[in-house]
């Protein structure tokens, strides 16, 4: 199974990394896993140029290799902290660039812009003790993935990480996904 992890935290050893690490310990050794660090990838933001309204892809070519990996994956893991009730900027820029699939589906009437069905999971960390950020991110992911032949099937919210980091129960739940 090809698993693509979209890692949205700037901290490679913070709470999101710990939650992602617990998930990775729970997957099969035979799985092919790639972690894409979005703060390193630095997706160029969408500027509404309209290219994807009429053609496949995007006028910006910085994500072509990434999009090919995404389309080929069997599973997509969105691992992100909550920033102001949403994603950090590079994750948001990436999700905005998924507009190419929205336009293909709704404007150009391509039933499944991504032919390979895939499953997705959310691994979300939040410094506070609220569910609001997770709920907003979950809705954004579900709606974006709905035109990408990708089904969100579960997730873990590790909240209150500003007070003691990721809890053992959250690590266990990520491992068991």
Predicted feature descriptions by range:
Residues 107-151:
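Short, glycine-/small-residue-rich phosphate/pyrophosphate-handling segment
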Residues 126-129, 159-163:
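A short, flexible beta-alpha/helix-coil linker loop
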Residues 1-80, 85-103, 154, 160-177:
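N-terminal beta1-alpha1-beta2 submodule of the flavodoxin-like/Rossmannoid cofactor-binding fold
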């Amino acid at each position: 199974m090809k698993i693509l992890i979209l890692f949205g935290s700037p901290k490679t050893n913070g709470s999101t990394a710990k939650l992602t690490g617990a998930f990775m310990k729970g997957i099969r050794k035979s799985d092919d896993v790639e972690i894409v660090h979005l703060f390193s990838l630095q997706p160029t933001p969408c500027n509404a140029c309209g290219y994807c309204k009429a053609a496949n892809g995007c006028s910006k070519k910085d994500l072509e290799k990434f999009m090919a990996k995404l389309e080929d994956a069997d599973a997509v893991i969105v691992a992100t902290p909550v920033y102001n009730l949403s994603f950090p900027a590079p994750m948001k820029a990436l999700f905005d660039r998924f507009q190419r699939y929205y336009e293909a589906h709704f404007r150009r009437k391509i039933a499944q812009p991504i032919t390979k069905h895939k499953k997705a999971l959310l691994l979300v960390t939040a410094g506070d003790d609220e569910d609001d950020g997770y709920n907003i991110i979950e809705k954004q992911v579900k709606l974006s993935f709905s035109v990408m032949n990708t089904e969100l099937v579960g997730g873990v919210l590790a909240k209150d990480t500003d007070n003691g980091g990721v809890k053992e129960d959250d690590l266990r739940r990520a491992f068991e996904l």
